[in-house]
Amino acid sequence: MADMEDLFGSEAESEAERKDSDSGSDSDSDQDNGASGSNASGSESDQDERGDSGQPSNKELFGDDSEEEGAPHHSGSDNHSEQSDNRSEASEERSDHEDNEPSDVDQHSGSEAHNDDDDDDDDEDDDDEGHRSDEGSHHSEAEGSEKAQSDDEKWDGEDKSDQSDDDEKLQNSDDEEREQGSDDEKLQNSADEEEKMQNTDDEDRAQLSDDDRQQLSEEEKGNSDDERPAASDNDEEKQNSDDEDRPQVSDEEKMQNSDDERPQVSDEDRRHSDDEEEQDQKSESARGSDSEDEVLRMKRKNAIPSDSEVDSDTEVPKDNNGTMDLFGGADDISSGSDGEDKPPTPGQPVDENGLPQDQQEEEPIPETRIEVEIPKVNTDLGNDLYFVKLPNFLSVEPRPFDPQYYEDEFEDEEMLDEEGRTRLKLKVENTIRWRMRRDEEGNEIKESNARIVKWSDGSMSLHLGNEVFDVYKAPLQGDHNHLFIRQGTGLQGQAVFKTKLTFRPHSTDSATHRKMTLSLADRCSKTQKIRILPMAGRDPECQRTEMIKKEEERLRASIRRESQQRRMREKQHQRGLSASYLEPDRYDEEEEGEESVSLAAIKNRYKGGIREERARIYSSDSDEGSEEDKAQRLLKAKKLNSDEEGESSGKRKAEDDDKANKKHKKYVISDEEEEEDD
């Protein structure tokens, strides 16, 4: 055995290295303390303290090296086979990388744990407890307590075998400790960069395929083929025990991820995972030159396939069970026969065969039969039955003819048939009637006023009184016309009509045809919409307008006469006798026409009937108009001019006239006063 200081170093060196590791970032110190705590748990002092504290170790929480090396293979296969579990497997790989860090540093911290004093072990245990409190937040307390007991039992036996192999591992751990110190310093500088690259790193880790991992393992095997020594029995036993625990830890992580459904990674965990990734990459590059490290690692990888293949076979069904829970399997596809195999729902009645009553075949509903006694009616309908739709000019009297109750048709009334059509008023001629009479032997027989004659050519004709109608036979389409007999509120079928008969008048000379044409003519003739009436009298409005026109003409004529007479008087006073005065008829006839009054006529009238003129002057007739007053003034004026008796007689007459006028005016005024007094 070599010198202990050469193998393990002095205590000063170990304390200096511990200070360097403590001065690192919180994430690095947590990782180193977790790694040293996981290896120190193999010692007896650690076992005693763990028994006193009752807290789970880092191995119980994170597993061993073999778990971390084997888990990527399983997670890679799961990623390749089932893409639906990418999120849960990405979280598994993240936890695997976190576990790789303490596995790479296990051997280094183990040598320091044996050489340090009990005080140092106490400090490391305190750090381990802090690290466990940080990292154990992802696991439930129930899982930690249950798994702690099972892992303690396993690792108690394994740690005893590991103690004998510590001497051999210490030599290999010296070189790794030196590289670890440099790695820690580099990790502090790259911690910030790794936080930024976290999202891309997680995706890259989740998408690693099995081929990439196999290539990496083959390259490492090629590098370590020349320097590979034979592995010790203790290492193989430790690897086997690691392989046994690996599926358990991976199952625990899967259960945790499935329970969480959406894994939530804290900032501290992300920093741990990024730092551990960096350490893995740099430790692998350092191990390329370090042959002894690679030898131990490759021996473990060579020993894994035999056991890990068995474990992978057992783990694949578990993953498949997870996907089966999410998406279902081929057995869940329902077929047409599944409904028969389904168990009956609780509370549903079940028959003797075990089938629900709803699925039983529906029994035919029995017919309801009601027994009713109806008298049987036998009718002798003859050999042939015909369906007849009577035309407008034919009618049938169903009751037998009786002269006592016979009512003739009235001209004023309208005959309507059963369908509401207006019948032609043919009176007795076109109505089919029948009656009962006795023959010569005294037997009652039926007699009718109509008969059907069948001719030799097969045609038929109906003779009704003196009228003859042609009968046409035609088949009926479909069995839709039946003969029924009314039985109370029901109908009893008797026969089915197969043929129908139609009737038409035989000739246009028959009375029936003439009445039909007349009725049609009356129906189709257009009534005169506008009637012109003769004027019985004259229009009063027209008469009124004519009277107004005549009155206007009379007024114009009177105005012309007055104007002419005024001019004549003025001329007479100035010149005396003139031609117009001496011969007035010549000018009057030309200018005034028939209505004008000549001076000669006035003279003759004055000479012939002075009294009449006076009576008219003194008359109070209201019918005399203004023209008569004017004419009277003219007469007076001319009388004065033509009077040869003198002015005395004229004055006398004027006074008489004035007196008469005054008396008349007084009478009128007295009447008005009386009316006002009333």
UniProtKB/Swiss-Prot annotation:
Biological process, per Gene Ontology: endodermal cell fate commitment; mRNA 3'-end processing; negative regulation of myeloid cell differentiation; positive regulation of transcription by RNA polymerase II; positive regulation of transcription elongation by RNA polymerase II; stem cell population maintenance; transcription elongation by RNA polymerase II; Wnt signaling pathway
Annotated protein name in UniProt: RNA polymerase-associated protein LEO1
One cellular component term from this protein's GO annotations in UniProt: Cdc73/Paf1 complex
Residue ranges, annotated region (Disordered): 1-373, 559-596, 613-678
InterPro entries, sorted: Leo1
Compositionally biased spans, kind Low complexity: 32-43, 328-337
Taxonomy of the source species: Eukaryota, Metazoa, Chordata, Craniata, Vertebrata
Annotated source species: Rattus norvegicus
Residues where Phosphothreonine is found: T200
Gene this chain is encoded by: Leo1
Residue ranges, compositional bias (Basic and acidic residues): 70-97, 105-114, 129-163, 205-230, 237-297, 559-573, 648-660
The protein's role, per its UniProt record: Component of the PAF1 complex (PAF1C) which has multiple functions during transcription by RNA polymerase II and is implicated in regulation of development and maintenance of embryonic stem cell pluripotency. PAF1C associates with RNA polymerase II through interaction with POLR2A CTD non-phosphorylated and 'Ser-2'- and 'Ser-5'-phosphorylated forms and is involved in transcriptional elongation, acting both independently and synergistically with TCEA1 and in cooperation with the DSIF complex and HTATSF1. PAF1C is required for transcription of Hox and Wnt target genes.
